[in-house]
Structure formats: structure tokens, C-alpha cells
Amino acid sequence: MISAKSVKELRERTGAGMMDCKKALTETDGDIEKAVEVLREKGLAAAAKKSGRVAAEGLVKTYISEDKKSGAIVELNCETDFVAANEDFIAFADALAKIATSTSATTVEELVNEKFDAEATIQEALTGLIARLGENMTVRRFVKFSVDNGVVKSYIHGGGRIGVLVEVACDVESPAVEEVAKELCMQIAAANPLFLSKEEVDQDSIEKEKEIYRVQALNEGKPEKIVEKMVMGRIQKYYKEVCLLEQLWVKDSDKTITKFIDEKAKEAGSAIKVNRFVRFERGEGIEKVEENFAEEVAKQLGK
């Protein structure tokens, strides 16, 4: 019988989870020292101790199926750019993107419970990687696309700093469709649109923008009778900044993205439709902890 006291002591010594500690003690007939070794071998002690540390570095990776009908984008985080450049970390991120493309999982929690290989789940394999490389790591997010008629395309910029996944539909197979998908990936990486079209912009966002522009115009001393006209002009400019189909093409500022797509649709002999896109930027939204080097050294020396 494994006592609660033994489980508590093992948790305090290793930082591993309660169920992992209980399992290790059961395997070792209650021998705490042997249980510590079991947890270390499994990487659970090291992984648990590191799990509280901020992981804001890492890689964004993508994978596209051979038939170009499906693909996935993932973000795998670690603590430093040094580990992000490690071959094992890169290989894990690549494998993760490939698994995400064919999985039925819809959440990260479901994804990490998928099989990584014949021996382990993704979470178990990640735990082992954490133990080997000595940093906290997390599978932060993933998105997968698939299309029956059309292509899924991806683009990685800056060695895994930014990743884009695009789904384009067309009833015919044509080099023009792939060209559209490729150029859209580059556009999204560079211009960072927030929406696909004007119709996707929620009304609350528009009303907030209108109010901001209205106050700005009044503060500039503009007559009230022309303020509304100015506001609508600025809203149109806002659409061109945040909506992919309204943006000017980065390769030719005389064309909007919509015009570029229409031209390619004529080449293909069929309508080309952008179904959806996603853009990941490594670490976006994660608050990094800024360490004071002198304080860190003093802490290490016990001062």
C-alpha cells in the first residue's frame, strides 16, 4: 500500500505529478530512491520542474500532403533560440506538423495524446525531449486545412519565426491556382491581414474604429458636416489595411489582391476562391520574463 506521505515526499523531491509519483512508487514497491530514478528515466521529474518556465521562443512549422489537398501549421515553443536551433527540436517540430495534418484532433490537448511513434504519444515524446535538452517546451497551437477541389499551400519566413497556411478552391487544376496560393502566402506573411474580406470584419470593430476616427477629426477642428465623410474614407482605408482581399499586392501596388486573383482565374478558366488562411508568429501574445543578469548571478551564488 502506497502512503500519501510517500507520494507527497516524492512530489516535493521531483516536482512530478501526483499520479506519476504514485505509479513510480507502485513500480518500485514504495522505494522512494528507486522511484526518483524511475521518474528521472522517464524525464517526468525534469519536465515537471521546467513546466513553470516561460517558453516564448521556438518554431512555427508547416506540412503539406503530397497531393496538396491538406496541410497543417503548428507552433512549438521552447525557452531559448539556442534550443530552437537544435536538430532534435527541429525534427520534433517537423514530425508534429506532419502528424497534425492527418489527425482527427481539434485541440492541442487531443493532439498531444496522439501517437508520436510506436513507443510513445506526442506528450510522452515531448517530455523526453524536455529531459534531454533541459528546457520547458509546449505545443502551443495548430491549425489544419483540407480541400477537395483546390490546393493548400504554406510558407515559412525567418527560419520558423512566421508561418502561413492558405486554402484556395478552384474547380480545375491549373498552375495559376498554385501561383495564387503561393503569392497569397507571401502577402499574408508580409502584410499581416486580420480578415479575409470586409464581410468578416465584425460590426463592433467597425463602430469602434468609426468612433476613434470621428473624435480624431473633431479634434483636428474639422467641421461636423464633413466629419462623417472623413470617417467613411478612413474606414475604407482600414479595410485595405486589415482585409486580405482589399489589400494592395506587395509585388505590384497598382493591383489589389482581388484583382490579382481575378486575373489568374481567367488564366485558369475557372473561378478561384480563397477559402481561409492563418498566420502564426512565434511567441506572439506570450509575455516574456525579462531577467536581470546581475540579480540572476546573485541568485545562483545564494546572495
From Swiss-Prot:
Predominant subcellular localization, coarse grouping: cytoplasm
Key words, A-Z: Cytoplasm, Elongation factor, Protein biosynthesis
GO cellular component, one term: cytoplasm
Compartments in which it is found: Cytoplasm
Keyword Protein biosynthesis: yes
InterPro entries, per database record: EF-Ts_dimer_sf (IPR036402), Transl_elong_EFTs/EF1B (IPR001816), Transl_elong_EFTs/EF1B_dimer (IPR014039), Transl_elong_Ts_CS (IPR018101), UBA-like_sf (IPR009060)
Gene Ontology MF: a single term: translation elongation factor activity
Cytoplasm recorded as keyword: yes
Pfam families, A to Z: EF_TS
SUPFAM superfamilies: Elongation factor Ts (EF-Ts), dimerisation domain, UBA-like
Superkingdom field: Bacteria
Protein purpose: Associates with the EF-Tu.GDP complex and induces the exchange of GDP to GTP. It remains bound to the aminoacyl-tRNA.EF-Tu.GTP complex up to the GTP hydrolysis stage on the ribosome.
Similarity comment text for this entry: Belongs to the EF-Ts family.
Protein's name according to its UniProt entry: Elongation factor Ts
Organism, as annotated: Clostridium botulinum (strain Alaska E43 / Type E3)
GN (gene name): tsf
